[in-house]
């Protein structure tokens, strides 16, 4: 992406003591699906969502999500690891839940826009912290009865986070089995709320 000298000034945060929680950043990306197509999408500073009490996401959990991180490298560049694979998985998840997939190229571009707009929140190299990026999509119009929604919203927000496990993950001993208890064609490969 860009070198640290070209990046906006870092926010005044105690990077080393960040937990894995939400800190509102300056911008997020929003695109709406209506009448069979996605709109252009835009960055916004508004972190609120207003939906019907009968929205598909609330009544039938029609939602998919992804998660990835942006890092500052030793050379001062901000990088995101393979967002194209997250885009591909989100498309597969959306199709499985009968949701209109958000185009993969637009997904990757939206991730870049959000990171660039919030680069002051990307922790410095060596801090142990990262910028967590959360793309998600949900049925936004009123739906009563078990059926897919007609309108959707795709959003990406980000938040600076510390390690998920403070002090690092502790190793455990496990036994690996060939037995697979997942249902054939189930949702085990999808990122959904079920």
Q: At which residue positions do the language-model features occur?
A:
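Short, hydrophobic/aliphatic alpha-helical segments
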Residues: 39-53
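Short helix/loop capping segments that flank catalytic or ligand/cofactor-binding pockets
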Residues: 40-41, 66-68, 142-146, 164-168, ...
């Amino acid at each position: 992406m860009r070198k640290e000298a070209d990046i906006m000034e870092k926010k005044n945060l105690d990077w080393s003591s960040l937990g894995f929680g939400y800190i509102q950043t300056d911008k997020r990306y929003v695109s709406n699906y209506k009448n069979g197509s996605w709109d252009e999408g835009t960055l916004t500073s508004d972190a609120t969502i207003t939906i019907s009490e009968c929205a598909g996401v609330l009544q039938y959990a029609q939602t998919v999500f992804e998660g990835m991180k942006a890092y500052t490298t030793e050379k001062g560049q901000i990088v995101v690891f393979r967002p194209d694979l997250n885009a591909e998985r989100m498309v597969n998840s959306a199709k499985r839940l009968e949701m209109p997939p958000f185009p993969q190229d637009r997904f990757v571009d939206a991730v870049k826009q959000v990171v660039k707009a919030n680069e002051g929140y990307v922790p410095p190299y060596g801090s142990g912290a990262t910028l967590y990026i959360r793309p998600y999509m949900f049925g936004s119009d009123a739906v009563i009865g078990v059926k897919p929604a007609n309108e959707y919203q795709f959003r990406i927000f980000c938040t600076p986070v510390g390690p998920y496990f403070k002090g690092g993950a502790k190793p455990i001993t496990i036994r690996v089995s060939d037995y697979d208890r997942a249902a054939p064609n189930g949702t085990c490969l999808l990122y959904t709320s079920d």
